[in-house]
C-alpha cells in the first residue's frame, strides 16, 4: 500500500470473470511509514474510513476494468451504504472481496466487503461510470499498474 499515491492495494489475488468476482489484499503501513497517521490520530493511529472506502473502490474498479478487458475505464460515480465495522490499525492485513451486481447503460455496480482475519471491517456498494480512455498511453499505464498488482492477464500487456 502506498497511501500518499492512493495506490491502496498490494495485490489482486484472484479474478473470476465468469462469476464476476475479485479478491484483493493490502497491508496497512506502520504508523511511522505514513504521515497520514500523524493526524489520524496522535497517540492512537487508525486507518481513515475514507481510505478504506478507497480500497473498496479500487477493488471494484479493477473488477469493472477486467470485465471489459481494460478497453474502457471506470470512473467513480457513487458510494452507497458504506459501513466501517471495526477499527483498522497500522500493520493490519485486509482482504477485499467483490462482485458485480449490475452492468448496463454505461454503469457497473459492485458490492465489496473488507475483512481482517476473516472478520468484516467494512463494506459498501460502489458504482462506476464506464468511459473511454482519454488516450492509449493512459490505458497502457493502467494495464501496467494491474500487472504490478499481479492481475492475471491472458495476453501480454500492450
Question: Positions of the model-derived regions?
Answer:
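Conserved positions in beta-strands of structured domains
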Residues: 10-13, 80, 85, 99-101
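Compact, glycine-rich, soluble single-domain proteins
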Residues: 39-48, 52-61, 76
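Hydrophobic beta-strand-centered segment that forms part of the acyl-chain substrate-binding groove
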Residues: 59-95, 123-131
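Hydrophobic core residues within well-ordered beta-strands of beta-rich domains
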Residues: 6-8, 94, 108
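Catalytic strand-loop segment that frames the active site of acyl-thioester-processing enzymes
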Residues: 4-47
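HotDog/MaoC-like acyl-thioester-processing domains
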Residues: 90, 100-158
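Short aromatic-glycine motifs in intrinsically disordered, low-complexity regions
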Residues: 1-3, 69
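Beta-strand residues in well-ordered beta-sheet regions across diverse protein folds
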Residues: 23-25, 97, 111-113
Amino acid at each position: 500500500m502506498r497511501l500518499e499515491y492512493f495506490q491502496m492495494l498490494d495485490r489482486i489475488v484472484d479474478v473470476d470473470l465468469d462469476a464476476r468476482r475479485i479478491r484483493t489484499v493490502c497491508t496497512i503501513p506502520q504508523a511511522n511509514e505514513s504521515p497520514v497517521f500523524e493526524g489520524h490520530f496522535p497517540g492512537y493511529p487508525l486507518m481513515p474510513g475514507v481510505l478504506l472506502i478507497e480500497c473498496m473502490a479500487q477493488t471494484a474498479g479493477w473488477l469493472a476494468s477486467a470485465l471489459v478487458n481494460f478497453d474502457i475505464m471506470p470512473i467513480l460515480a457513487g458510494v452507497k451504504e458504506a459501513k466501517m465495522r471495526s477499527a483498522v490499525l497500522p500493520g493490519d492485513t485486509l482482504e477485499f472481496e467483490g462482485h458485480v451486481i449490475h452492468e448496463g447503460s454505461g454503469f457497473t455496480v459492485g458490492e465489496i466487503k473488507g475483512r481482517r482475519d476473516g472478520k468484516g471491517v467494512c463494506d459498501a456498494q460502489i458504482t462506476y461510470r464506464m468511459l473511454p480512455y482519454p488516450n492509449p498511453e493512459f490505458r497502457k499505464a493502467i494495464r501496467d499498474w494491474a500487472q504490478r498488482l499481479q492481475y492475471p492477464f491472458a495476453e501480454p500487456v500492450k
